[in-house]
Structures are given as structure tokens and as C-alpha cells.
Amino acid sequence: ARVCSDACSIIGDICKSVDAKTVTKSKSMIGEEIAINDYLEKNGVDPVETDLGEYIIQLRDEPPSHIIVPAVHLSKEQVAETFREKHTDLPADRVLDNPRILLDEARGKLREKFLSADVGLSGANMLVAETGSIALVTNEGNADLSVGLPRVHIVLASIEKVVPCMEDAWTLLRVLARSATGQDLSVYTSFVTGPKRSDDL
């Protein structure tokens, strides 16, 4: 796609072709740039952010406050208040007073969405020209579920993500986590090369 509107139209057409009602999304900064969530909603598709921070701010109808930790500005009390307001089936006596309980609440809701999604939409940390693979890096594992569970997977990435070969991808992966969060490697690093081919094991 040459412009944002073209990218949105292509994604919308794919969703329409499979009669998609729900799209699970792993974190995609380019998705923010082209306002893909707004486009999908206007076209009758429910986009669900699956990164925990992105999910929280989506419920609050706020933009991300930070590129890596999008809900860093919120207290656990604000997150609990958001869940009470948006998770309408939440029992009134359910205690939401610590991060682990909040995580469990979000995980339960997101699992339902992962299992019912028609389309998964991901970004790509790298596009490997040598193999046609995408590299996905997360600390939550949500990208793997967005890629692997729905029957259709759409990758939204721009040209600067292309690297020549796997060796280059591995070199950049070592730098990526350190520069973003100070980790040696992120918890989940996945390479996806499309559906199984006849010469795969």
C-alpha cells in the first residue's frame, strides 16, 4: 500500500472476504499510525488489542502513553475501575486489588477473544527477505496467539522492517530487547513463515 487509506482498505477487504466479526491484534505501531482500529470499527469489525497495556487503554478509549509500555501512566486502581466498568459480567464482590488478579481478569477476557477471532493482525519486528519470514517479539506471548489461532493472519509492516537474512535478524534481536527494556532477549521471539509447505517436516 502506498498510503494509509490503501492499507486500511486492503485489511478491510481481507476481513470482508472471510466475513470477519472479530480481529485480535498484537501490538503494531504502524496500526496506530494508520488508525486501523477506527477503520475496522467503522466497517463493523471488532478489533481487540491483546497486548495487556494496549488492551487496557483500548477499554479506556485512550492513545498509548509510551511506545513500549502503553498504560504506564495508569495506577492499578484505575485499571480495576476500568475493568469494573467495561467487564459487565464481573461479579460486584470480585476483588481487584493487585496486579496478578487484574492480569487474570484480562487474561480470561482475552482468551475468549483469541478463541473466537476470525482474523489475527500483527505487526512485525522484522521481515526476513531470505525466507519470507516475519519476526515477532513480545513479553506476553499474545502475538503467537493472534497469529496461530485465527484462520487468517494479516501482517502490517513497513519497508524499513526488511532485513536480508536470518543472521541479520538474530543480530538485530540481540539489540532490540536491550534497547527497549534492558533484557538480553524478550520472553517470546517467534518466526512465522506462513502455512506449512509440502517440504516442511
What is each of the regions a protein language model found here?
Residues 1-201:
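The feature marks the mature, well-folded catalytic cores of soluble enzymes
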